[in-house]
């Protein structure tokens, strides 16, 4: 469940900005039908920053309910205050959630020792498997391989989503962790190379609109069929890149709407709808991938 193509799911909203239960069900059904390994609910792509704490928990639990055991659900529970991250994570103890994705603290930029103590404290307050999340381009904080190696010794810290796009990190981390520690790419454009170097899968934005393609690519990579996997990846490469032509999740929400997966591409401020220029770029990438 923690390998292959794991989707960083968008949070669908109606025109008033309320979470749409019907569209959420449609998205989940789409991923069940198309081979996605698991869903991350309310991560960055799911607009965790603009949901209230109550909404955050409610969306995760709604996702779990609508998934109905058909696909594993991972909860995004990161925060830049350790006590808040613990509280968010503990909400899902004994809920049926299979694990939590916890991002490095953002804005306050802790030291490596601060990062270690932060994730250690979360792990001590839950039995849920924990996936570390390193995305310095968003957080301003880079968790180094040595810190990952220390954290990997804690029993319920079982994986990392490594989103630097720096492929040398695969080698560096693998040298410091046990063979059963899971390495997940957080960068769609380099995910196949990441897997070829020993990674186990990807937590994907692209999978929101190309679920079958991403699932097939990851399956082929796991089987060592990299030529076949690369053929899929080449079709998707413009999409991997152009889904970030404007800040995530602006482009991917519009793409979901363009494919009829959601009714609107509504976001909450300070996120604003995609520009005409951005829309044209994403549309061309969808067409290149054979999705539109």
Curated annotation (Swiss-Prot):
Keyword annotations of the record: Amino-acid biosynthesis, Cytoplasm, Diaminopimelate biosynthesis, Lyase, Lysine biosynthesis, Schiff base
InterPro entries: Aldolase_TIM, DapA, DapA-like, Schiff_base-form_aldolases_AS, Schiff_base-form_aldolases_CS
EC number: 4.3.3.7
CDD domains, A to Z: DHDPS
Keyword Lyase attributed: yes
GO cellular component: cytosol
Any one GO molecular function term: 4-hydroxy-tetrahydrodipicolinate synthase activity
Nuclease in keyword set: no
Active site residues of this protein: 133 (proton donor/acceptor), 161 (schiff-base intermediate with substrate)
GO biological process, one term: lysine biosynthetic process via diaminopimelate
Residues under site feature: Part of a proton relay during catalysis: 44, 107
SMART domains assigned: DHDPS
Major enzyme class: lyase
Primary localisation category: cytoplasm
Subunit structure as annotated in this protein's UniProt entry: Homotetramer; dimer of dimers.
PANTHER family recorded: 4-HYDROXY-2-OXOGLUTARATE ALDOLASE, MITOCHONDRIAL, DIHYDRODIPICOLINATE SYNTHASE
Function: Catalyzes the condensation of (S)-aspartate-beta-semialdehyde [(S)-ASA] and pyruvate to 4-hydroxy-tetrahydrodipicolinate (HTPA).
UniProt similarity note: Belongs to the DapA family.
Protein's recorded name: 4-hydroxy-tetrahydrodipicolinate synthase
Organism of origin: Salmonella typhimurium (strain LT2 / SGSC1412 / ATCC 700720)
Organismal lineage: Bacteria, Pseudomonadati, Pseudomonadota, Gammaproteobacteria, Enterobacterales
């Amino acid at each position: 469940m923690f390998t292959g193509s794991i989707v960083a799911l968008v949070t669908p909203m109606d025109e008033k900005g309320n979470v749409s239960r019907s569209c959420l069900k449609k998205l989940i059904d789409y991923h069940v039908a198309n081979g996605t390994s698991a869903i991350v609910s309310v991560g960055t792509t799911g607009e965790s920053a603009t949901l209230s704490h109550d909404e955050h928990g409610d969306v995760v639990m709604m996702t779990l309910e609508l998934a109905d055991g058909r696909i594993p659900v991972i909860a995004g529970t990161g925060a830049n205050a350790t006590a808040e991250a613990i509280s968010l994570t503990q909400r899902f103890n004994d809920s049926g959630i299979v694990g939590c994705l916890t991002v490095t603290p953002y804005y306050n930029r802790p030291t490596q020792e601060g990062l270690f103590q932060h994730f250690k404290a979360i792990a001590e307050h839950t039995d849920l498997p924990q996936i570390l999340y390193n995305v310095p381009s968003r957080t301003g904080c880079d968790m180094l391989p040595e810190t990952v190696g220390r954290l990997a010794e804690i029993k319920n810290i079982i994986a990392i989503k490594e989103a630097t796009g720096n492929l040398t990190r695969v080698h560096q981390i693998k040298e410091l962790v046990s063979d059963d520690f899971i390495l997940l790419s957080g960068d769609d454009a380099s995910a196949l190379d990441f897997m070829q170097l020993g990674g186990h899968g990807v937590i994907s934005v692209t999978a929101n609109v190309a679920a079958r393609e991403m699932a097939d690519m990851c399956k082929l990579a796991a089987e060592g069929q990299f030529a076949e996997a690369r053929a899929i990846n080449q079709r998707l490469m413009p999409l991997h890149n152009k889904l970030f032509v404007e800040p995530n999740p602006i482009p991917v929400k519009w793409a979901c709407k363009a494919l009829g997966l959601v009714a609107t591409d509504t976001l909450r401020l300070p996120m604003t709808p995609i520009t005409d220029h951005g829309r044209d770029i994403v549309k061309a990438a969808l067409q290149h991938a054979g999705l539109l």
